[in-house]
């Protein structure tokens, strides 16, 4: 006889089965419950080396995310606008499964994938309410690195 305990997780119900004879426990995960979320915030972090797109609900809970490196781009190809477009497309498709319709976009960083990621989100059918640039700008802070000599 196996004893079944239900453990409520934040997103899914996990059943813990304990076998009395062997005293081993195993976990089985049920299907994830998808919530219907209409509004969200897209965070686009574009550095010189990579582009990371996170899509969260209005409370700040991340629903989906993708990066150029996660999509299989390596090295200097991660910093291209095309890689940012593919990453934004992937994050958007996951967010569309939750029924998301409108986005407020926050862009951070000096990278080349900023505008391309925005266009990819808009092409996926999201209505973009606002675009906010949150790139940190120093008020004459630390000394910048010396110029490259190639």
From Swiss-Prot:
Family: Belongs to the universal ribosomal protein uS11 family.
Matches recorded under PANTHER family: 40S RIBOSOMAL PROTEIN S14/30S RIBOSOMAL PROTEIN S11
Subunit structure: Part of the 30S ribosomal subunit. Interacts with proteins S7 and S18. Binds to IF-3.
Cellular component terms per the entry's GO annotation: ribonucleoprotein complex; ribosome
Superkingdom of the organism of origin: Bacteria
MF terms in GO: rRNA binding; structural constituent of ribosome
Alphabetical keyword list: Ribonucleoprotein, Ribosomal protein, RNA-binding, rRNA-binding
Function: Located on the platform of the 30S subunit, it bridges several disparate RNA helices of the 16S rRNA. Forms part of the Shine-Dalgarno cleft in the 70S ribosome.
GO biological processes: translation
Pfam family, one: Ribosomal_S11
Identification of the protein by name: Small ribosomal subunit protein uS11
PROSITE patterns documented for this protein: RIBOSOMAL_S11
InterPro entries: Ribosomal_uS11, Ribosomal_uS11_bac-type, Ribosomal_uS11_CS, Ribosomal_uS11_sf
């Amino acid at each position: 006889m196996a004893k079944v305990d239900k453990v409520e997780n934040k997103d899914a119900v996990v059943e813990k089965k304990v076998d009395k004879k062997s005293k081993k426990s195993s976990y089985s995960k049920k299907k994830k419950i998808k919530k219907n979320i209409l509004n969200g915030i897209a965070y686009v972090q574009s550095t010189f080396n990579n582009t990371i797109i996170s899509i969260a609900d209005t409370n700040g809970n991340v629903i989906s995310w993708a990066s150029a490196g996660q999509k299989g781009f390596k090295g200097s190809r991660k910093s291209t606008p095309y890689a940012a477009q593919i990453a934004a497309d992937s994050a958007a498709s996951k967010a569309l499964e939750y029924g998301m319709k409108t986005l407020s976009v926050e862009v951070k960083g000096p990278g080349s994938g900023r505008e391309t990621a925005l266009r990819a989100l808009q092409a996926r059918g999201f209505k973009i309410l606002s675009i906010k640039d949150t790139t940190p700008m120093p008020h004459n802070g630390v000394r910048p690195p010396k110029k490259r000599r190639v």
